[in-house]
Amino acid sequence: MVRYDPEKYAAVADNFVYVHRALRRDLSRIIEGGAELFERDFPRFARILAKHTELEDSLFFPALEERAPGSTTMTTAPHQEIESLAAALVAEDSGGDPSERLRALQELLVAHLREEEELVMPAMMEHFEAAEIWALDGRIMEFCPPEFMQEMLPWWFTHIDAEDRVAVAQNMAVGVPSEVLPVLCQWISAGLDEAEWGALVARVPALTSGAV
């Protein structure tokens, strides 16, 4: 079992572990839910996937390429193929069964996310100090308008398990400006039921600043 520096792992985990898990779980749920669920929820999934790809292509990967040229080259073609397939599924208006193309997307996405976790994430930890990764992470809001965050945060916390929620919330509690945290907490709580939110706040008391 590979052991990583815990500070560096915490810094990269939001983007390369916890978002990846949510993407896998939500796509599986949509596939299993049939046509009605696809029509309702896949457009949101596609928007969040597109923003995740944009953040990697515009923020994290260029920084890594400066330190380790060629280390993200393997992501270019999969990003393009996955985004093209997702966009085509959103644009589809024939009313046909999307299940075959959804499973093709799932196969591509799962393989690609695994590749990033096995190759890109370790490279980030090798070539950056934890503080440098946190600094990159702190720039995410430059790429994400408030309306996107209001949609993404409830989605994210819905599709990760209780332990992952705690890890992400702890990162937010120490990394997000104090004046911003209450708003993020309100958006997160909107995606959880009362018991789930209460359990999370009990583990991460700083979230009470955003309780409603």
Each model region followed by its residue ranges:
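Small-residue-biased structural context
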Residues: M1-V212
